[in-house]
Amino acid sequence: CFPPGIYCTPYLPCCWGICCGTCRNVCHLRIGKRATFQE
């Protein structure tokens, strides 16, 4: 996703959505990915 997206904190460690527009505190295996910055 471009431009770079949201920084995920230790409390909200997961990106959610195609562009990682929302950080969540739970990772779902298929639709969540753990990241600091989205790529």
Swiss-Prot record:
A GO cellular-component term linked to this record: extracellular region
Native source organism of the sequence: Conus emaciatus (False virgin cone)
InterPro entries named in the record: Conotoxin-I_CS, Conotoxin_I2
Keyword hit for Disulfide bond: yes
Protein name (record): Kappa-conotoxin-like Em11.10
Tissue-wise expression: Expressed by the venom duct.
Cystine crosslinks: 1-15, 8-20, 14-23, 19-27
Record key words, sorted: Amidation, Cleavage on pair of basic residues, Disulfide bond, Ion channel impairing toxin, Neurotoxin, Potassium channel impairing toxin, Secreted, Toxin, Voltage-gated potassium channel impairing toxin
Propeptide residue interval(s): 35-39
Domain free text: The cysteine framework is XI (C-C-CC-CC-C-C).
GO molecular function, one term: toxin activity
Residues that bear Isoleucine amide: 31
Function (record text): Inhibits the vertebrate voltage-gated potassium channels Kv1.1/KCNA1 and Kv1.3/KCNA3.
Protein family: Belongs to the conotoxin I2 superfamily.
Pfam family, one: Conotoxin_I2
Annotated localization: Secreted
Main location: secreted
